[in-house]
Amino acid sequence: MAASWQWENATAGAVAGFATVAAMHSLDVVRTRFQVNDGRGSSLPTYKNTAHAVFTIARLEGLRGLYAGFFPAVIGSTVSWGLYFFFYGRAKQRYARGRDDEKLSPALHLASAAEAGALVCLCTNPIWLVKTRLQLQTPLHQTQPYSGLLDAFRTIVKEEGPRALYKGIVPGLVLVSHGAIQFTAYEELRKIIVDLKERRRKSESTDNLLNSADYAALGGSSKVAAVLLTYPFQVIRARLQQRPSTNGIPRYIDSLHVIRETARYEGLRGFYRGLTANLLKNVPASSITFIVYENVLKLLKQHPTTKD
């Protein structure tokens, strides 16, 4: 497998990441605000549901509020998806080496996805932390608001130290299972659809068998499975990544503290706050990601680079 193939995957993944953020960011803001609102003294307004949240943010904060944290989200998503598809492709290539059958087992797809997810998490956690904090800023924010991405980085390092950039890394690493589940489900469902279509049209290659509607269905269905199994860890990470109060005391100390407090005051429901907004965002977002990724990859394969 040529090195250019890996860069084709990375490029297609980066373009897919950008397209996904551009289309769905406002729902990401809503989801994040629901996730951290534990009902115990918050600078955020109380929202009744997803639609109410969208209209309230638009009315009180305007378009800027709905797109809070957009710049780090674009950087984070573009870099994350680019790296993810690159590492994922490299891992699959390594596991396939020396095998007579090029098709990998579900376990090897899972291992490839987990490996890629862990590497991406370590590379991008600071970007996601800044994105979360910018999304939680409102006109009523109690502390001096960050003016943007660079100011947020500088202020966090100055006030909390460099280690603060990796708050939420533990649940983030656990969330590697999210991507692993999604990609394994995607690959296995993709095999089923390809096999069904190959029986009908034996003359076409795999690339031509699937269309954008297939990629949308595969991306959406695989995302639902991953979200339902791993969503509580997204809530835990978001709560850990909140900005400390004006006296510098964080609301939560670590992941176990979040789990204890959430279970005590909110019960199981607390771990699924923002789930509706999350599904409304991520199911179509995942479809967009895979539609763009597969089509950009197909385009790049039709016009390959000369480098190996």
UniProtKB/Swiss-Prot annotation:
The keyword Plastid is assigned to this record: yes
Gene3D superfamilies: Mitochondrial carrier domain (1.50.40.10)
Phenotype of gene-disrupted mutants: No visible phenotype.
Membrane topology: Multi-pass membrane protein
Annotated tissue distribution: Ubiquitous.
InterPro entries in the cross-refs: Mitochondrial_sb/sol_carrier, Mt_carrier_dom_sf, SLC25A32-like
Subcellular location: Plastid, Chloroplast membrane
Keyword GTP-binding: no
Record keywords, A-Z: Chloroplast, Membrane, Plastid, Repeat, Transmembrane, Transmembrane helix, Transport
Residues passing through the membrane, by range: 10-30, 74-91, 110-130, 164-184, 216-236, 274-293
Gene Ontology CC: one annotated term: chloroplast membrane
Highest taxon, organism lineage: Eukaryota
GO biological process, one term: transmembrane transport
Family membership: Belongs to the mitochondrial carrier (TC 2.A.29) family.
Protein name as catalogued: Folate transporter 1, chloroplastic
Species this chain originates from: Arabidopsis thaliana (Mouse-ear cress)
Gene: FOLT1
